[in-house]
């Protein structure tokens, strides 16, 4: 597969990637973090596919991460068990939406998200996964190797979110007249400001009353450059991404915080930070350095609802 040499990962208009390059590699790193969390005795999630994605990709550092870890994870996000809490938050969002009667879910930039296979969806739910063609093809190949079957009506939509993804989504069977559960997890830092604005506009245009959205996004209290500075301070070769600096893939542009964007358009919003999630899930942290505390408080785990 493609080399993990970051020198070739500079972002550009219309860039693309497979699972071991650029933004695709971040999905693989996230899968490694989910695999590590799933093996904990007090695991917040159960993702049996995460380790298989990592092993199939064959990237040595990530394989070592999930098979030979003998030291605490070093980056701020890992230090706080951020991936376990984030994944649990989105798991609960989708299951609660489905339990309320919402029968279609859309996972934007799905990456190696395995919820269509690992969550206990009610009968009649359709889950749409949108991402780059090479990423979805890799994931489908691993599912085939494992003999895995989805627990819902899973439909993949191979499309770049900078293109006309609403048309591709509708072609796959999406019905804009029915309420939808949307997710934007680990996505927004990789979008320019204009692309984020367009993404939100399209979500709203496609949302019937009663729709919901779960979004991981900045509160606006910490700029992306400050965020990257703290990440770099604590990053080491022992954390999931090793020598790879994923913040170089971020767009450091002024963006409207999602909570503000959706609120002014009539959606009700509820935002939680990482420490709110820790309290909800009973995660205990050791003494947290002030800059890590500031970093954790700068990200919202947001639930937005369009009144019925």
From Swiss-Prot:
GO terms for MF: methyltransferase activity
SUPFAM superfamilies reported for this sequence: S-adenosyl-L-methionine-dependent methyltransferases
InterPro entries reported for this sequence: Ppm1/Ppm2/Tcmp, SAM-dependent_MTases_sf, SAM_mthyl_Trfase_ML2640-like
Binding-site positions, S-adenosyl-L-methionine: 131, 160-161
EC number: 2.1.1.-
Enzyme's top EC category: transferase
Signal peptide: none
Sorted UniProt keywords: Methyltransferase, S-adenosyl-L-methionine, Transferase
GO biological process terms, semicolon-separated: methylation
Family statement drawn from the similarity comment of this UniProt entry: Belongs to the UPF0677 family.
Chain's role: Exhibits S-adenosyl-L-methionine-dependent methyltransferase activity.
Name of the molecule in the record: Putative S-adenosyl-L-methionine-dependent methyltransferase MAB_4585c
Organism: Mycobacteroides abscessus (strain ATCC 19977 / DSM 44196 / CCUG 20993 / CIP 104536 / JCM 13569 / NCTC 13031 / TMC 1543 / L948) (Mycobacterium abscessus)
């Amino acid at each position: 597969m493609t080399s993990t040499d970051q020198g070739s990962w500079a972002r550009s208009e219309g860039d693309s990637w497979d699972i071991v390059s650029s933004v695709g590699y971040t999905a693989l790193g996230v899968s490694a973090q989910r695999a590590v969390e799933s093996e904990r005795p007090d695991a917040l999630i159960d993702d049996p596919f995460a380790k298989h994605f990592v092993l199939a990709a064959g990237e040595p550092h990530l394989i070592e991460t999930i098979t030979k870890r003998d030291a605490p994870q070093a980056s701020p996000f890992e230090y706080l068990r951020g991936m376990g809490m984030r994944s649990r938050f989105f798991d609960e969002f989708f299951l609660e939406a489905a339990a309320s009667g919402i029968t279609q879910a859309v996972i934007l930039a799905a990456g190696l998200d395995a919820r269509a296979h690992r969550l206990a969806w009610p009968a009649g739910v359709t889950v749409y996964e949108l991402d780059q063609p090479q990423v979805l093809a890799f994931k489908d190949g691993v599912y085939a190797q494992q003999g895995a079957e989805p627990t819902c009506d899973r439909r993949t939509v191979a499309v770049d979110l900078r293109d006309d993804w609403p048309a591709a989504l509708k072609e796959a069977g999406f019905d804009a007249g029915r309420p939808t559960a949307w997710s934007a997890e680990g996505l927004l830092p990789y979008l320019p400001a204009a692309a984020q604005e367009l993404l939100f506009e399209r979500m709203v245009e496609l949302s019937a009353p009663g729709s919901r959205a779960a979004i991981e996004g900045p509160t606006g209290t910490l700029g992306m450059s400050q965020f990257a500075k703290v990440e770099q301070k604590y990053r080491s070769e022992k954390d999931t991404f090793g020598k790879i600096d994923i913040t170089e893939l971020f767009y450091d542009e002024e963006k409207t915080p999602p909570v503000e964007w959706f609120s002014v358009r009539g959606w009700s919003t509820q935002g939680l930070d990482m420490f709110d999630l820790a309290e909800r899930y009973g995660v205990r942290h050791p003494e947290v350095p002030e800059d890590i505390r500031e970093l954790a408080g700068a990200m919202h785990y947001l639930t937005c609802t369009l009144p019925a």
